[in-house]
């Protein structure tokens, strides 16, 4: 039976981590071994947004591995395709990760600066050609350190999706143009973390914060999804992952060890509800015909506005993909180049993909 270990931050992150690592039998596993820690640092934003891994947890994991005589401990990530090339290192420096790793006497690496392994015709569910960082395969132990989030394409983004950070930056959009849920499952057949530590440490959704841990990535993501207030069986990456033999999705067949999960349940807003709450005057059309080239920089820009407490003061219609029908709203904005036809009352932020900076700049004119 798969096991998932839960520990609240009652006294310190260090104590909670020590509990789940001990319960999972990790002390004997890391001794004398090389370890790669893979957090989620897709953008240079603070962990307090709930979008990137808490540097305090990264520090705790690095120190725990060092204290248990790991031969080498490295922290590595490959940020989002939509993070400008000049800002990639900022995903380490501006998030506080670089500082804590260096203080521990360890090393952080940007995958983009190192070698990649090329895959050709691996699966009909994957892009014909894509590249994975060699660092996914160089270490004895891979510790996956995701942040639990909702996502407009996969509903949730936890451990399974966090492995996309190993892809070469230019190849990441290819996974979105394919069926992303199936592609993520196929990627998880290639890269296998030794343990997954889900970072629920920010108090954004729970009063105390906690850690969920497990070696079964589907089981760990399934329990985490349930704790987010969502049904694992409604998440395609989890149902497909279970069917592919990657792990257990049935909560009745997963042993939860440690904290009582009933006291940890939260309510994460799905993207549609989040948009209605923060931008009630916003209408988005054509999103079902748009790829991530438009949707990722758009939702990232909207998140940035929401975090600043900003909203639109009058109705605004955003048109994506091949949507070209006219809008009754006094303000209309087209995103991307998919549709050659632009209604008379619309602005356009063009490009394939369009610039996040330009999208944010244009949206800011309407708040």
Where in this protein do the model-derived segments appear?
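N-terminal and secondary-structure boundary signal
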Residues: 1-367
């Amino acid at each position: 039976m798969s096991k998932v270990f839960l520990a609240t931050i009652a006294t310190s992150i260090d104590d909670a981590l020590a509990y789940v690592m001990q319960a999972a039998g990790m002390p004997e596993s890391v001794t004398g071994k090389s370890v790669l820690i893979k957090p989620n640092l897709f953008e240079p934003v603070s962990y307090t947004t709930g979008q990137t891994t808490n540097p305090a947890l990264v520090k705790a994991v690095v120190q725990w591995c060092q204290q248990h005589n790991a031969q080498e401990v490295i922290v590595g990530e490959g940020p989002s395709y939509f993070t400008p090339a000049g800002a990639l290192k900022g995903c380490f420096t501006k998030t506080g990760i670089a500082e804590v790793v260096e203080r521990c006497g360890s090393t952080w690496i940007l995958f983009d600066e190192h070698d990649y392994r090329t895959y050709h015709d691996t699966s009909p569910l994957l892009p014909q050609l894509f590249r994975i960082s060699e660092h996914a395969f160089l270490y004895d132990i891979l510790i996956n350190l995701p942040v639990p989030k909702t996502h407009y394409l996969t509903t949730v983004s936890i451990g399974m999706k966090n492995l996309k950070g190993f892809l070469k930056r230019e190849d990441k959009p290819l996974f979105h143009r394919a069926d992303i849920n199936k592609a993520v499952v196929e990627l998880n057949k290639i890269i296998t973390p030794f343990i997954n530590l889900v970072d629920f440490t920010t108090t954004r959704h729970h009063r105390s914060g906690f850690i969920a841990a497990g070696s079964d990535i589907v089981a760990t993501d399934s329990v985490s999804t349930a704790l987010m207030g969502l049904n694992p069986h409604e998440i395609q990456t989890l149902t497909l992952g279970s069917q592919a033999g990657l792990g257990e999705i049935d909560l009745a067949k997963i042993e939860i060890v440690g904290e009582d999960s009933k006291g940890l349940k939260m309510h994460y807003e799905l993207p549609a509800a989040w948009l209605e709450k923060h931008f009630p005057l916003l209408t988005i059309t054509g999103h079902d015909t748009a790829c991530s080239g438009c949707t990722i920089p758009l939702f990232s820009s909207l998140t940035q506005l929401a975090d600043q407490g900003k909203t639109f003061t009058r109705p605004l219609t955003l048109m994506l993909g091949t949507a070209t029908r006219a809008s009754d709203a006094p303000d209309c904005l087209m995103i991307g180049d998919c549709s050659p036809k632009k209604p008379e009352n619309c602005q356009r932020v063009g490009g394939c993909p369009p610039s996040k900076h330009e999208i944010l700049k244009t949206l800011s004119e309407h708040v």
